């Protein structure tokens, strides 16, 4: 094994019997709710929208579940990032400017502007959907976590964000 040591993994026991997902009365009452947000951007940057999502989740009367957040675009994305220090999101945006520059002569897709293909690449390197647990009618985000729309185009845009909550 070329000097490598085998690591023995701990064994886990599976619970025997069926897994039940029921409320106190014994019946399963899983709800599914959806909502669409429109976020208007002023061009490139990270736009926080944790508050809007939190208000909607609280209004849904779902104690425990999973929230999916989906960006309906290919030139914008979603990130969960620190929300305490604004320099974090500025540094993140600056990093993507350096890693995926505009006006690269190797880009073939240029019909929608010189910022479009880099926007697609940046969106591919991040995420267009997020999944967040919901407990106690609240998103189970960490203390310093916020949800951001990451706009990758220079011009103002209207971005559709679909929220889907499933739980009981």
Task: Enumerate the predicted regions with their spans.
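N-terminal amphipathic/basic-hydrophobic helices that include classical n-h-c signal peptides
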Residues: 1-28
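Active-site histidine-anchored catalytic micro-motif
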Residues: 19-168
């Amino acid at each position: 094994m070329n000097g490598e040591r085998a690591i023995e993994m701990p064994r886990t026991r599976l619970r025997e019997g069926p897994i039940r997902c029921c409320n106190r009365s014994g019946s399963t009452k899983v709800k599914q709710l959806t909502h669409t947000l429109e976020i208007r951007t002023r061009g490139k940057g990270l736009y926080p929208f944790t508050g809007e999502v939190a208000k909607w989740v609280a209004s849904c009367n779902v104690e425990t579940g999973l929230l999916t957040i989906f960006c309906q675009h290919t030139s914008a994305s979603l990130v969960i990032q620190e929300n305490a220090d604004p320099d974090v999101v500025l540094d993140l945006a600056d990093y993507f400017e350096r890693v995926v520059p505009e006006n690269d002569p190797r880009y073939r897709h240029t019909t929608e502007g010189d910022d479009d293909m880099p926007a697609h690449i940046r969106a591919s390197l991040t995420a267009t959907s997020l999944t967040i647990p919901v407990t106690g009618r609240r998103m189970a985000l960490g203390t310093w976590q916020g949800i951001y729309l990451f706009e990758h185009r220079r011009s103002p845009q209207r971005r559709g964000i679909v929220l889907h909550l499933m739980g009981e």
